[in-house]
Every structure is written in structure tokens, then in C-alpha cells.
Amino acid sequence: MKTSRLRTASAIFVTLAATATAAPAFSGTAVAAAQASAVRQQVDFNGDGYEDMIASVLDGTVSGIKKAGYVAVYRGDAKGISPARHQVINQNTAGVPGSAAANARFGGSAPADIDADGYTDLLVSAGNGRPIILFGGKSGLGTRAVEFQGQGNAVGDFGGDGRADVAGIDNTEWAGRIVLSENIGADGSVGSTRTALTADGVTTYEGLQAADINNDGKDDLLVRTGCNDEPDCGGTSLYLSTGTGFTRTDIVTAPGTYLNHASVTVGSVNGDAYPDLVFTRRPTGLDSDVDFPSKGGAVAVALGGPKGQNTSVKPKWITQATAGVPGADEKGDALGASAAVGDLDGDGYGEVVVGLPGEDVGTAKDAGGVLVFKGRASGITGADTKVIGQSTVDVPGVDEQGDAFGGEVHVVSGAKNVPATLAVAAPGENTNQGGVWLFKGSRTGPVTKGSVSFGEASLGVTPSAVRFGNWLG
């Protein structure tokens, strides 16, 4: 059971021509982003059957070059993820195009089996240069890499032909557009491009995410929008793929809810064949906050269905004021700054994990924490919600001001009905050096006993203020 989160599309922007001469395109049907059910293929770079994890360190130093950026890959095995099993890839790594450069911020990620060989690949950005495809293989990532000649970082099979496509945002014109790069060649070339959506000149495209919400074998697009002249505008819209285009489908809300300015995470909460949409929103300081029922942030689940959203179950905001949820709904808590979905107790339903990086613990301002909402057939409620922080028994470390524990969360899936592992980052740990904590799942959810933490030092480098763990995938 996998999760993915809509991040801003600023990670990768490259302008491209309308067509390109391509190398032979990859063929086959095993494309990671092509959904057969709500369960997305594992992120498994070496094909051993165990989920891997990456930490993208955009501000990492490489050979003395500041903010060159690197990706740390943590390989999974039968015991889960271990900090000891890692691989570091940067632009000085043999076979990776280019070379490490100051402020290039190599990283970001879009994992998918782009060449349909059964190994997960990784699409990364490299500053002002072209994106790079790191191909997976028996030895993992890094044995083969090419420059990607298209644009974007939302990888999916939008045409339903078994081939990976990449969606990107092109804001070079007055009216922005979303462009699909198709028929990707083994050398990173793009056989053809087409404009999938065009903005109206008022709306701006800010982020993209691919997922097969209606489970028809074609990936759909979740599009995050803003407005050119109005800060209190924007939200997330769902566009269902028809194979040759996209049809906008409204996301229905319940009375009193407000999904504008919300972030969205995709994952299976209720255990059926359709991915669900987990919305999180924090107060913005704008007029729309009047309609938003929270001081510190909220989470709502819109269940998926054959038409995109199962409208028979309307989403409801859950806050720290909801019965059963630990803590209090307070200004600055930043509930929902991060979110992930995964089956942490092995019952077939996905738990919803949301970060509370602004939570004050005692006198430690912004020490942070995470909330774990139990997944059910109807979604989530406040009942049986757990909170985890550095003051929780058996969790390494102590609550300190500015740790921002919960600034990023990620779920590493296990085998079917085997509890997944929860990864939580505290990007502000040790004066912004950052760190990551791993909590194994159990029949009662994530457990703190035996949990471990690690940071940049585990990679054999001198830690610096890189906010390690700020980007997990």
C-alpha cells in the first residue's frame, strides 16, 4: 500500500520543443505508475521485492561544493529499512550526467519504472540543467543514467498503453499549460509532446501528481492551482484521463469544509480498489480562514471511486479539537504540514499520518510531533488516534525548540498485510542539521520500542545545516 504527495512543481521546469526525434521507445506493460489497483508498485530500485527509501538532500555539500545536492538511497530487506544500508548519488557519481555545482540542488524525486524492466527508476532535477533519469537495476540506482529531454516530474501512464509518460508545467507563456512527454527513449529523448491542459490566464498551475484515482488503467492528474492576482485563491482539481485527454471532475466537500489552499496525499485508506485523497490544510492568514474550522490545521479524506470521488461519503475536517485526537487545536501547530498513508497495523486499511512540526511540547516551542489516524472502511475519525514525539517513551532524542519533528513523514510498505514502517523527519534537529526516525509497524500500529534515528553523519560526512530528511520518498 503506497502513498504519494502533491508537491510544488518547481522542482523541475524545462522548456521543450513541440516534437523531438526519439530513440526507440521503451515497451512493455510493467510501468510503476500504471495502476492495477489502489496499491502502487513498490519503490524497489534493485528488484529484490523489498521497498526502498530515499532522502533527497537538496542543500547537501558534495566534495566541498555547497548546495550541490545529493540523494541518499536506503535499501530495504526482510527486516525493513536500515541506515547502515545506504548509497549516495550525486552529479560526481560515475555515470551520472554533469558534475556537482554550487546551488544546483541535485535531487527531488519521481520514482517510477520508466523503462518497464521491473526496476524502479528515479527522475531527479539538477539545477538549471535538464532533469536526469537514474535507472534502477539488479545493483540498484546509479549504474545507468541519462538526461531527460522532456520536462516535468509527474510520471504516469496517462494513455493506458503501458508506457510511462511525464507531465510537466510550462509557464513560459502568458497562459500556462501542462505538457505531456510521451514515447520516452532509452537515451532520455522524447518521441512526442502534447498539451494536456491550458490555463485561462488567471489561474496558474503550481503542482502536479499522477494517480489512477478511478482504477481504469489510465493515470489521472491532480493539479494544484493558484491565481495571478489573488493570493486567496487556488486549490486542487482532479482531471480524469480519457486516454486522449483529461476531463475535470469536482471534488465534493461537506458543509462547513473548505479545501482551497489544501495539500493532497494519495493512498488507500479504506482498503478498496480506488486510491483515496487525503487533504491537509493550515490557516493562511487570508480571508478564507473564516470558513476554515481550525487554528492549527486539519485533515480530511475524500474516498476514491469509479467516477473519481465516492461522493456518498463526504469529507469532514478533523482537527486536534475532534474527539479522540490528542492535544489541542492551537495556532501555529502546522497540522498537516506533511502527510502519508500506509497500512501500519497490517489490517488492510491505510493509516493516515500527519505531521505537527509546529507543536509546542512543554517549553520547547515548535518541537513537533506526528498524529497517526487509524484507517477504516469509512475513512478516518478521531478515535484511536496516536501521537508520537521525541518525548514519547523509547523514542531517541529529546524535544528541543525548533526541531520540527513531523516536518516530513513517509511510509515504507511491507508485504501484503504485513505492517509497514513509518519514517518521520525532524528537519530542524540540531540547529537545522536534521534527522530521520524509523518506527516499525505492528498489529497495534507503529511502535516506539526499538525505534532508531539517524542523520547525515550516518553517511560518513560531517553534518551541516542541510535539514536532512526534509524530502523523503
Identify the residue ranges that each predicted region occupies.
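Blade-edge motifs of beta-propeller repeat domains
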Residues: 2-38, 75-105, 133-154, 180-203, ...
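Beta-strand-rich domains and repeat architectures in extracellular enzymes and scaffolds
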Residues: 35-74, 105-108
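Beta-propeller blade termini
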Residues: 36-50, 107-116, 150-160, 205-213, ...
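Acidic/hydrophobic-patterned starts of short beta strands in beta-sheet-rich repeat architectures
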Residues: 47-57, 116-125, 160-169, 215-224, ...
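Hydrophobic strand positions within the blades of repeat-based beta-sheet folds
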Residues: 53-55, 71-74, 89, 106, ...
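Short glycine/acidic-enriched loop and turn motifs that connect beta-strands
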Residues: 58-64, 128-130, 171-175, 226-231, ...
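A detector of repeated loop/turn-to-beta-strand junctions in beta-rich toroidal repeat architectures
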Residues: 66-70, 83, 121, 128-130, ...
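Beta-propeller domains
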Residues: 200-210, 214-366, 373
